[in-house]
């Protein structure tokens, strides 16, 4: 069985079809604008911005778009949007808990779109706090194995604040407190270990095992939510079979 982290990592490696690439670009640009607004336009002194830029470049977002997003976010160019972060909570098929992260300039529009998408795909909204307690905010770094053992990775990050290293199959997941994420990332780089992504994420404390049919319904719901313009990320506490994961 595989959890959300392995599913998200597998999905990240798949090519994004043209119909969805525009939405992906928009989400990546939003992240850059917000990071520049909060921490300033210099990625050397703003690790959140540096990570947002790296993710955008990994998805082939043009450099000009990236630079303009930085300037807008930092107030150096007109046209910046005052994005508001919101987290919605809900349940999917099989009782799976969902945290839905949004960045929006219209709270009412975001709430309506998320609620409609949940209802149409077998989900339901939940009251604030009724789902969030099932997740912990963690720093998550995904490291491709590339011939390395779990002990190799653990040795590189243990003194940097890493809490654990999990085997995801083709990669390792390094977990830390959010405040230690930059130190963990830098420790990997110093050891010559490449990482695929470094994010602050919601990690479930308990996973719900799903049969294959329910798992497919949950993944369809998450995909529909991720297609919403205001939704940046969706987190869920499920275990699904490797057979269903292979269909992603």
From Swiss-Prot:
It is found in: Cytoplasm. GO terms for biological process: regulation of DNA-templated transcription. The keyword Transcription applies. Keywords: Cytoplasm, DNA-binding, Transcription, Transcription regulation. The keyword Transmembrane helix does not apply. InterPro entries: Integrase-like_N, TACO1_YebC-like_2nd/3rd_dom, TACO1_YebC_N, Transcrip_reg_TACO1-like, Transcrip_reg_TACO1-like_dom3, YebC-like. HAMAP family: Transcrip_reg_TACO1. Belongs to the TACO1 family. This is Probable transcriptional regulatory protein Acel_1346. The lineage of its organism: Bacteria, Bacillati, Actinomycetota, Actinomycetes, Acidothermales.
């Amino acid at each position: 069985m595989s959890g959300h982290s392995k599913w998200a990592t597998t999905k990240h490696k798949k090519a994004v079809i043209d119909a969805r690439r525009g939405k992906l670009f928009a989400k990546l640009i939003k992240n850059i604008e917000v990071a520049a607004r909060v921490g300033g336009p210099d990625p050397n002194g703003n690790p959140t911005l540096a990570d947002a830029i790296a993710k955008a470049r990994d998805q082939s977002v043009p450099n000009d778009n990236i630079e303009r997003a930085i300037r807008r976010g930092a107030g150096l160019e007109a046209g910046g949007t005052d994005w508001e972060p919101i987290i919605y909570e809900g349940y999917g098929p099989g009782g799976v808990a969902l945290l839905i992260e949004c960045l929006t300039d219209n709270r009412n529009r975001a709430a309506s779109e998320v609620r409609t998408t949940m209802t149409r795909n077998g989900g339901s909204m939940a009251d604030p706090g009724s789902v969030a307690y099932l997740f912990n905010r963690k720093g998550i770094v995904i490291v491709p194995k590339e011939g390395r053992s779990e002990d190799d990775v653990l040795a590189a990050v243990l003194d940097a604040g890493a809490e654990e290293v999990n085997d995801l199959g083709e990669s390792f997941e390094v977990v830390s407190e959010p405040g230690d994420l930059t130190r963990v990332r830098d420790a990997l780089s110093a050891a010559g270990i490449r990482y695929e992504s470094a994010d602050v994420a919601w990690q479930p404390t308990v996973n719900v095992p799903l049969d294959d049919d329910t798992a497919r319904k949950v993944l369809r719901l998450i995909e529909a939510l991720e297609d919403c313009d205001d939704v940046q990320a969706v987190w869920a506490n499920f275990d699904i079979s490797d057979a269903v994961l292979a269909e992603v």
